[in-house]
A protein has these predicted regions:
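Short, basic-rich loop-to-helix N-cap that marks the start of a DNA-contacting helix
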Residues: 60-70
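Alpha-helical residues within the helix-turn-helix
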Residues: 33, 44, 73
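Short C-terminal boundary/hinge segments that cap the last helix of small helical domains
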Residues: 76-93
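N-terminal flexible/basic segments that precede or flank functional cores
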Residues: 1-20
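Conserved hydrophobic/aromatic packing and binding residues within compact polymer-binding modules
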Residues: 28, 42-43, 53-56, 82
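Interfacial/linker helices and their anchor residues that mediate assembly or domain coupling
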Residues: 90-106
Length: 106
């Protein structure tokens, strides 16, 4: 009997990118363009193809923690930069909130 496939967590629902991945990608693009850096140059600096950088910036592919750390170093920002200015609508779509597991701040 085949085992059920475990969700990768990449898509929020119905094939749409996770809103947090889209936000992180938009912050990567913002910082890259503020530095006047091309996708090709950023990709080369972190050992990827420019197509992969495009996918990160669109939120189509999730950025892993070690890759996010590398991006932060190359783009000269703290890792937290990628999560700044996140709209409440995006924050409300986190899995723990969707499942009712998050506790409101005290």
């Amino acid at each position: 009997m085949a085992r059920p496939r475990k969700s990768s967590g990449r898509m929020a629902s119905k094939g749409f990118p996770n809103p947090i991945d889209v936000h992180v990608g938009s912050r990567i693009r913002l910082r890259r363009t503020l530095l006047g850096m091309s996708q090709e140059r950023l990709a080369e600096a972190i050992g990827l193809t420019f197509q992969q950088v495009q996918k990160y910036e669109r939120g189509a592919n999730r950025v892993g923690s070690s890759r996010l750390f590398d991006l932060a170093k190359v783009l000269d920002v703290p890792v937290s930069y990628f999560f700044e200015d996140m709209s409440p609508g995006v924050q409300d779509k986190t899995p723990s909130k969707l499942m009712g597991l998050a506790h409101p701040p005290a």
